[in-house]
């Protein structure tokens, strides 16, 4: 009842930096981390369409068309990672007081959650 017709800031509440997550994500995916430098994901993935088709065939993945799999996410990631910006943006911080007062208090570890969902995507053959 406290949540009816309300708008809430929804976040796990944990402040994190992507560069701190890369080693754990790489471990789940059985790959090495790359250099810590900016990367234009839209250009990167656009240049690897044939590579994805080959990976998808080799690993029996569900989606062989990389652009269908990604949708617009690689463009959104460029925005979130501030690709091309002169300086890194500050972490996005929002107040979660209102949502907690309405009774939504559950939280999840960010690294563990990302690792879990990458494992699910792998198990369901969306990624190799």
Language model features: what each stretch is:
Residues 1-82, 95, 124:
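Mid/C-terminal beta-alpha module of Rossmann-like enzyme folds, strongest
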Residues 90:
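Glycine/small-residue-rich pyrophosphate-binding loop that anchors the diphosphate of NDP-sugar donors
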Residues 100-128:
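C-terminal/domain-terminus segments
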């Amino acid at each position: 009842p406290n949540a009816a017709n309300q708008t809430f800031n929804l976040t796990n509440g944990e402040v994190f930096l992507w560069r701190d997550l890369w080693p754990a994500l790489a471990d789940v995916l059985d790959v090495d981390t790359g250099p810590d430098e900016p990367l234009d994901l839209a250009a990167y993935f656009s240049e690897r369409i044939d590579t994805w088709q080959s990976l998808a065939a080799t690993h029996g993945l569900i989606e062989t068309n990389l652009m269908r799999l990604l949708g617009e996410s690689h463009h959104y990631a460029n925005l979130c990672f501030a690709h091309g910006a002169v300086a890194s943006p500050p972490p996005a911080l929002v107040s979660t007081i209102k949502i907690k007062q309405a009774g939504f208090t559950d939280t999840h570890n960010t690294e563990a959650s990302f690792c879990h969902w990458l494992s699910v995507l792998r198990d369901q053959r969306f990624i190799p």
